[in-house]
């Protein structure tokens, strides 16, 4: 893993892979605020500690594009690591940027005998997501209503529970929608920062689900390169990110 200063020279552009909530910042001047893409341009200083993670700004894509992808780099790297060939994977919040990156990596891992199913709230989102080719199916359900999600999800999986679910919904009370459709000994990955440990742990206990739950660790080995490679490999996803997040 990279450590600050070991392979850098003055003037290099880098992207911190540590959350801003964990990064000491001295903001000297705010230049502009981009509300539509959650970005603020500033003049200032940031402190990266010896254990901090970063990567050099890639030369083959724009800065806004790289930043948009690296913001959620942990998710697609986990989606590459967790599934196996033939698995069924359920991705909640399928329209978000972390979810489409996860879908792409999961599709590669599960292969032609597996399934990657996305869950969205609006029917109007389905056609565009299917066009991306990162899901085998996209279903419409409210992720705060776990029974609705389970019924819709099992309906496109021949009535079978899922091996893995990935929760990318950034709103509260979606824990049970990620847990309920998953089989015993399956895996639930909560990437969303809105996840409540209490709701997830007690909810799984309350319905008698013996599942492994991972709470969204943002770091996975090589996660930055894995995520940037998704945009290099998939022109449709790159176009989506360029249009929506840059």
Question: Where in this protein do the model-derived segments appear?
Answer:
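Glycine-rich beta-strand-centered segment in the early N-terminal region that forms part
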Residues: 1-20
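Short, well-ordered loop/turn sites that connect or cap secondary structure elements
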Residues: 6-10, 83, 182
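N-terminal Rossmann-like NAD(P) cofactor-binding module of classical short-chain dehydrogenase/reductase
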Residues: 15, 163-166
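NAD(P)H dinucleotide-binding glycine-rich loop of Rossmann-like/cofactor-binding domains
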Residues: 15-86
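Mid-domain Rossmann-like dinucleotide-binding core that forms the NAD(H)/NADP(H) cofactor-binding site
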Residues: 61-140
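Short amphipathic alpha-helix with an adjacent loop that forms part of the alpha/beta core around
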Residues: 146-160
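Glycine-rich phosphate-binding loop and adjacent beta-alpha segment
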Residues: 169-234
């Amino acid at each position: 893993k990279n450590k600050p200063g070991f392979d850098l020279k003055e003037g290099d552009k880098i992207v911190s892979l540590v959350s801003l909530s964990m990064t000491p910042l001295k903001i000297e001047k705010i230049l502009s605020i981009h509300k539509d893409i959650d970005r603020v341009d500033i003049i200032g200083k940031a402190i990266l500690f010896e254990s901090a993670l970063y990567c050099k700004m890639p030369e083959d894509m724009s800065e806004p594009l790289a930043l948009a992808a690296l913001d959620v780099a942990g998710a697609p790297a986990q989606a590459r690591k967790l599934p196996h060939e033939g698995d069924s994977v359920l991705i909640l919040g399928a329209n978000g940027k972390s979810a489409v990156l996860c879908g792409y990596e999961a599709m590669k891992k599960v292969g032609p005998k597996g399934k990657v199913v996305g869950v969205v709230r609006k029917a109007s989102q389905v056609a565009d997501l299917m066009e991306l080719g990162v899901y085998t199916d996209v279903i419409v359900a409210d992720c705060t209503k776990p029974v609705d999600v389970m019924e819709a999800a099992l309906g496109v999986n021949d009535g079978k529970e899922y091996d893995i679910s990935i929760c990318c919904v950034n709103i509260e009370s979606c824990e049970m929608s990620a847990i309920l459709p998953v089989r015993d000994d399956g895996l639930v990955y909560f990437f969303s920062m809105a996840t409540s440990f209490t709701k997830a742990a007690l909810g799984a206990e309350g319905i008698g689900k013996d599942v492994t739950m991972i709470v969204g660790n943002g770091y996975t080995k090589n996660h930055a390169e894995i995520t940037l490679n998704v945009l290099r490999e998939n022109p449709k996803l790159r176009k989506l990110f360029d249009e929506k997040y840059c």
